[in-house]
Amino acid sequence: MTQRPTLWRQLQKARGRVEDRPHALWSATAHNAGKAGTRRRQETQVQWKKLALGALVVAGAAAVGGWFSLDKETRGLLATFPTNRDLLFWSEPQRDAAFRALDRIPLLARSHMVPASGTPSPLPPGEPLPLRTDINAFMAGQRSAALLIVQGGKLRLERYGLDFDGAGRWTSFSVAKSFTSTLVGAALKDGYIRSLDDKVSDYIPDLKGSAYDDVSVRQLLTMTSGVQWNEDYADPQSDVARFNNHQPEAGQEALVSYMRQLPRAAPPGTRWLYSTGETNLVGTLVQQATGKPLATYLAEKVWGPAGMEHDATWLVSKTGQEVGGCCIQASPRDYAHMGLFILNGAKVDGQSIVPDGWWEAATTKQADIGRPGHGYGYQWWTNDDGSYAARGIFGQGIFIDPQRELVIVTNANWAGGACDPAAMKAREQFYREVQQAVDAEQQRSKD
């Protein structure tokens, strides 16, 4: 069921039928290249949109009891309300507000609900893990909203920042990719997908005749399709920046409509290229194969069985399909639950939801990414020491180390942008320090 927050009803009378004209609110004209005169007109249009949209939202809130009747997160988002969907270009305060509330404002994005488990399983507390790291300094440098360490099945560190707490939801960005790939494994075991060597177009007929016609499910999972894509987060003309504003062809899903027009750059299986668009297609493939929305299948195969403590949401495209490559909103503890679920083989009543051998393949290097010691599996970033991670822009992550029974969850809003090199390096160093702390503790227990 599409998530319709209370604010949706609060805004209906004030805004009329604005949602029927998405181009009026969701354009990214302020960032588009063009002649100086055109650019000035575009910037003026955006300013008028911001004024109109701000008045619209405040009027809607006031009409049903006023600003202070809204929850803190929604007030924070409205106070810095972005004028478009191009979050790659939002200001730091806008991101701070929005990352905890993307699913609160349907004018920005709509979502489907993933209900909490009927049998929630709170994380048991453990002894604090002795760390040399100054946690306060590390979190300040990362601009962390949440930092959790689960080791040996127990919660050994749980800290929050940016005026966020564990009761809220924080967006996943590309961490969702690893959730989507897990649903591929589930669909394979359930018989909805016959083989990873099947053609993608067997499941998404609208891709027939496109560059994806001869691409296998496996190649899509490992981002080795050979289809051209630009994932440059700093470029407003990149595919990752433009596809949200694409107007789909009549009768086609928005995500498929954009991807089917892309040209081939290399033969299938010969080159790895990171592409959020390809994971969007993975999500579409699962939906087409199972006949179920991704949110429904996630609730059935993961959220319920794993004992998730809170509701989650999954943002949907203009045509109403969950965006497989991005944007689950969940509590930090439930991200930790997901890490534990994967660490323990995604088992329900002793049986894994994925086929035998799935995790060995999914979490080890299937594609060379050009970094010694690292690779890419089935939508997981892999390390030669056996650890692996789900990663999202601006500092989202679930790091899993089976050898040490370790899960680390990070939610953040990096100051240096989507792929802040300094913040990324500091996080990798933190992972190593946690691993060393676990090793030292285990050694002391043996002595």
Regions found by a protein language model. Give the residues of each.
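Active-site Gly/Thr loop motif
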Residues: 309-312, 356-407
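Short, low-complexity intrinsically disordered segments enriched in A/P/G/S/L with frequent Arg
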Residues: 3-4, 21, 30, 39
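Catalytic-site signature segments of enzymes, centered on catalytic residues
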Residues: 166-167, 232-234, 241-319, 326
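N-terminal leader/targeting segments and the immediately adjacent pre-domain N-terminus
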Residues: 26-165, 193, 222, 260, ...
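Active-site-proximal alpha-helical segments within enzyme catalytic domains
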Residues: 278-285, 324-347, 396-413
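Active-site-proximal loop and beta-strand segments within enzyme catalytic domains
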Residues: 136-137, 165-167, 187-271
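Active-site helix/loop module of the DD-peptidase/beta-lactamase fold
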Residues: 171, 190-228, 261, 288-326, ...
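Active-site SXXK
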Residues: 153, 170-196, 220, 282-286, ...
